[in-house]
């Protein structure tokens, strides 16, 4: 958008309009200072200049005062609330204090003070630009729990003081087939919470920050009684395993589900499956996780995938498998564990291509599918179910100044099972030197 305007002998002022065209307004300039003020406004805020040109010039001093007030109001509309978070500036992934502005609260927006934010493996990939799409500076975080501090005039679902959550995305078109079916998570123009672009083209910044402004449609109610630190990872990890279990019928009492991997996703999957009343077998390459799976998480069986005897004994017994592992691993042998027509759902995303010969799935009519988080309807249902059954993630709570160490540990899988940042209890710092 151009930031220049021209004055003509007819005292007409031309400046860029918010819609991309040219807006022309008559302004009888009777004061040189008014001209200078408008020039200054136009160089910093065309929209503020547009407002200022409607002021008459019968009283230059009053005009200047009103124009400055209009500029201040316009600045609030354009830049919103000052915020501070921790951002990565390059692919070193190192996070440090970062000052920026949240958008101004609109009629259908909810303003949230961030209390806790989980750290997801996706955050690690983003800050290190592992996927080549990082938009630095980037404030990570999409497992957000907080308290409502303000609502727009049109908000009907929330009020100040409500405990709420925000997950992986904060926008969708709400007109496509996926949105119509309640799967906003598959909307082709979905706006992700961090390292995305909103519909106005601005970069989205996540929950490693003190506050966030979100359209009420994408805000979730956190049930009373759930520990907020343990609830935060449910906004991503929880719905990522809950949603496909419901979609594929792996939520029926008495059915047998296999859970591959016992990490951040896997341990939550075991909790949900047991709450559904299912028979649960944890499948792992690590025999040392047996006790954790059986005694602490309540799984019914533990299967070492490298043990041919154990694999043979369990062949054809499972109604479905939820594969939560994000590292490459042999998958063909796992299909032998499933009954005919059963599905293996991938919620982890190894970067190396899977090796899957057709004979692993064709003879039994077995299927392979994937899942990415869940829609708003499923996410709220997941939180409500978690509240009823007391399900939370197993977490290690940290302060923000430990976040870089936590990222290093996460890269080594040195966490049981999720890191959660106590944002409200941290000193976020911030110098004001890098506002956007």
From Swiss-Prot:
Pathway where this protein functions: Aromatic compound metabolism; phenylpropanoid biosynthesis
Family: Belongs to the zinc-containing alcohol dehydrogenase family.
Pfam families hit by this protein: ADH_N, ADH_zinc_N
Keywords: Lignin biosynthesis, Metal-binding, NADP, Oxidoreductase, Zinc
InterPro entries: ADH-like_C, ADH-like_N, ADH_Zn_CS, CAD-like, GroES-like_sf, NAD(P)-bd_dom_sf, PKS_ER
Cofactor-binding details, from the entry: Binds 2 Zn(2+) ions per subunit.
Protein name listed in UniProt: Probable cinnamyl alcohol dehydrogenase 8B
A GO biological-process term: lignin biosynthetic process
Assembly: Homodimer.
Organism: Oryza sativa subsp. japonica
Biological function: Involved in lignin biosynthesis. Catalyzes the final step specific for the production of lignin monomers. Catalyzes the NADPH-dependent reduction of coniferaldehyde, 5-hydroxyconiferaldehyde, sinapaldehyde, 4-coumaraldehyde and caffeyl aldehyde to their respective alcohols.
PANTHER family membership: ALDEHYDE REDUCTASE
Catalytic reaction(s) noted: (E)-cinnamyl alcohol + NADP(+) = (E)-cinnamaldehyde + NADPH + H(+); (E)-coniferol + NADP(+) = (E)-coniferaldehyde + NADPH + H(+); (E)-sinapyl alcohol + NADP(+) = (E)-sinapaldehyde + NADPH + H(+); (E)-4-coumaroyl alcohol + NADP(+) = (E)-4-coumaraldehyde + NADPH + H(+)
CDD domains: CAD1 (cd05283)
Positions with a binding annotation for Zn(2+) 2: 173, 176, 179, 187
UniProt key word Oxidoreductase: yes
Required cofactor(s): Zn(2+)
Gene Ontology MF annotations: cinnamyl-alcohol dehydrogenase activity; coniferyl-alcohol dehydrogenase activity; zinc ion binding
């Amino acid at each position: 958008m151009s930031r220049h305007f021209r004055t003509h002998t007819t005292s007409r002022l031309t400046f860029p309009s918010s819609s991309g065209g040219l807006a022309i307004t008559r302004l009888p300039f009777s004061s040189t200072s008014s001209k200078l003020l408008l020039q200054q406004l136009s160089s910093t805020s065309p929209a503020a200049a547009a407002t200022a040109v409607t002021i008459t010039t019968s009283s230059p001093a009053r005009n200047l005062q009103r124009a400055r007030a209009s500029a201040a109001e316009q600045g609030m509309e354009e830049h919103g609330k000052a915020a501070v978070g921790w951002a990565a500036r390059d692919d070193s992934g190192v996070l440090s204090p970062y000052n920026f502005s949240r958008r101004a609260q609109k009629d259908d927006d909810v303003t949230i003070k961030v209390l806790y934010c989980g750290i997801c493996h996706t955050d690690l990939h983003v800050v290190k630009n592992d996927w080549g799409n990082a938009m630095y500076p980037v404030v990570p975080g999409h497992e957000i729990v907080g308290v409502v501090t303000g609502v727009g005039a049109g908000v009907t679902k929330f009020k100040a003081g409500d405990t709420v959550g925000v997950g992986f995305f904060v926008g969708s078109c709400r007109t496509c087939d996926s949105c119509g079916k309640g799967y906003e998570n598959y909307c082709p123009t979905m706006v992700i919470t961090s390292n995305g672009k909103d519909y106005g083209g601005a970069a989205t910044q996540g929950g490693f920050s003190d506050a966030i402004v979100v359209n009420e449609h994408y805000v979730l109610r956190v049930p009373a009684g759930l520990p907020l630190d343990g609830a935060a990872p449910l906004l991503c990890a929880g719905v990522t395993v809950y949603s496909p279990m419901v979609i594929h019928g792996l939520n029926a009492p008495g059915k047998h589900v296999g859970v591959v991997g016992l990490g951040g996703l896997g341990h939550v999957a075991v909790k949900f499956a047991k709450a559904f009343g299912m028979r649960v077998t944890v499948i792992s390459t690590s025999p040392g996780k047996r006790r954790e799976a059986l005694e602490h998480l309540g799984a019914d069986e533990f299967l070492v995938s490298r043990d041919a005897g154990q694999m043979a004994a369990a062949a054809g017994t499972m109604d479905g498998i939820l594969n939560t592992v994000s590292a490459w691993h042999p998958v063909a042998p796992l299909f032998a564990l499933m009954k005919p027509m059963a599905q293996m759902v991938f919620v982890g995303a190894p970067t190396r291509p899977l090796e899957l010969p057709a004979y692993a799935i064709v003879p039994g009519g077995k299927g392979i599918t994937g899942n990415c988080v869940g829609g708003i309807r499923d996410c709220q249902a997941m939180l409500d179910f978690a509240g009823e059954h007391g399900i939370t993630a197993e977490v290690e709570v940290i302060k923000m100044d430990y976040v870089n160490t936590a990222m290093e540990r996460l890269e080594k899988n040195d966490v049981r099972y999720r890191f959660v940042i106590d944002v409200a209890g941290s000193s976020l710092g911030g110098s004001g030197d890098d506002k956007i």
